[in-house]
């Protein structure tokens, strides 16, 4: 098959790449500012009125909508913004763009430095933990929740104490508290900004007396100061951070340590995206490239599904069921006991 293109085609393609890069940032901003929700509900909005109502800089708001229009997400008719042909799909995947740009933007911006081995020492990259928590709350809701609730409904018991490793915004514990009125929750989170966000969230939603958070690293669970509360936990969850346990020898040790730290856990729900295998470069779906490349830059090993299957028994757990998630890269929720 010929790969030749005309100069005109090449220029247009490169312009589209450039504009799509700008639009990618605008998607996360439009979501966070409420524009995507308003467009999803009403089908249109007035950009000038939207800017004035939300105390936003009008020329910059116009630029944001222009970026979205350049790739068919919206259409512009003067100051009126209408949904475009790709709006629904973008609105569904908006949190993935937010994770990439608002949450991980600094990592990708510094790519030339991060790729140099001489620079890969100490804290050689930065990400915005609060922005990542903001995005991951909706990513979890839209992609992991169906599998999560399927696992919860099949527990066969009513938990009394739940712990969430890498608890982020606290949404997972809030969901569990809503489902089981008598349950208490404990979140273990390494990022102070995420804990601050989570504490505000649980207080706002009326769960401040049932859900609490402690700063700690699930990979070093023995160092977490809430160890005395772990023995009460009978349901353990961990979503979108299990890959941080790897490489293999670390994953086995971390799983063993978690098993020992939570001796009375009856079910451990572990959900994460895994590394894909064999997808042609031009057929990669949304999120996959950013997730895998981003973690490669951070030096975080991403296991495949088969590699996960190979560590549970050695790590002190038995996998009783797997819930495959095909809508987000190659993701899964493991039920462990």
Residue ranges and their predicted role:
Residues 198-199:
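Conserved SAM-binding loop
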Residues 158-168:
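Conserved class I S-adenosyl-L-methionine
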Residues 184-189:
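Conserved SAM-binding motif I beta-strand of class I
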Residues 191-193:
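Conserved SAM/SAH-binding beta-strand->alpha-helix loop
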Residues 269-315, 319-322:
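C-terminal alpha-helical "lid/dimerization" subdomain adjacent to the S-adenosyl-L-methionine
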Residues 244-257:
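A short, conserved alpha-helix within the catalytic core of class I
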Residues 169-181:
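Conserved SAM-binding loop of SAM-dependent methyltransferases across substrates and taxa
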Residues 17, 62, 67-160:
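Conserved Class I S-adenosyl-L-methionine-dependent methyltransferase catalytic core
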